[in-house]
Amino acid sequence: MKILLITSIYLPHIGGIELYVKNLAANLIAKGHEVSVFVGDRFVKKISDSVEYGIKTIRVPVFYFKGMTYLRSKAGRKILEKELSSVEVVHLNDVKFLYKFLAQKKSIYGYKLFFSSHGFIFHTKSFLFLKKLYMKRMSKYSGFYDLNYCVSENDLKIAKDFKFSNLKMLIPGCDVKKFSVIDPNKFEKNVFVCFGRIAKNKGILELVKLFNSCSFDFFLKIIGKCDDDAYFQKISFIAKNDSRIEFLGYKTDEEIKDSIQAAEFLVFPSLHEGFGLTLVESLSSGKKIIANKIETFTQILTDCGLPEFLFDFSDDKNSLQVKIEELRKLPTRKINLEKYSVEYMSDVIERGYMGM
């Protein structure tokens, strides 16, 4: 099959959607399908068509406003429609980008149409009323999609609340062996590592505030890129006078592995997640984790038999210190994560594409 995956955020940015799209594309290619990735990229000024990570990738400039993403030019739309006219399957990965457009074009070009939720639009509570109006409007087009994949129980509930149709629950797959080479019993004491995309919903500001208030010895390393300058300035203002907190910026996978190996604890302070792919990948390291007690993380860690890794980041510094000491008393262990594997996920999606 000829397949087009569409996203508004992609590598080299670090995050769950980016990895989901790349992993899905790579696995479908390995199965013999012809796959391209179409990216509405607000950080590029020119249209590009190249091979990235072994995958044909088309990047077009977009206009980004209040979380919404729109194609900026007729040239970008023309290229998209050319791709739509030649594929059998289209798979969208952002409800804020082309959801209505792809539904309207389906009858013209005759492709099968799929969607993955990735938290929908509710990563923060800002503009909540407008977000609800938008979701209500988009739900009218959900019936044009052969399947709307919900990546978590929370997303499935949201979809049902807004009366989306053609729903299927499917946990995103990831590289469940990504950090398996790491020895969980080798670490530098009091080193905490947080990695991934830096954004408001990731809870980095709250993380820095909490650790900054702590009097015990620690070294917090934060890996990732922030595209919101105003938000990053708020974080930096608190952290700049605390030598225990260090921002390392963007790092390669190998560099991230080195940082994880050195860490005593991995920290996931997210306020909201569509799924939590980075958390699942990190479980393959066997390292002890401190993850915010949000619905998605609770679902994953409870399912994996690791509820002790949950912590309410709204608690105070004393509670954090208690949690750290509790975790230090527990043995390290690696668990079987095969049901979260990208191979399993891509098999299910491939069958969906085929109507099975």
Regions found by a protein language model. Name each.
Residues L19, N190, C194-S213, A230-Q233:
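A conserved mid-protein helix/loop that constitutes part of the nucleotide-sugar donor-binding site
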Residues S48, K157, K221-R244, E255:
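Short, structured helix-loop element that forms part of the nucleotide-activated donor/catalytic region
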Residues L92-Y99, S117:
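Short His-centered aromatic/hydrophobic patch
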Residues K131-N148:
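Membrane-proximal helix-turn-helix segments that form the acceptor-binding/catalytic region
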Residues N154, G173:
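Carbohydrate-associated surface elements
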Residues L271:
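Aromatic "clamp/platform" in nucleotide-sugar-dependent glycosyltransferases that forms part
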Residues K288-A291:
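Short hydrophobic beta-strand element within catalytic cores of glycosyltransferases
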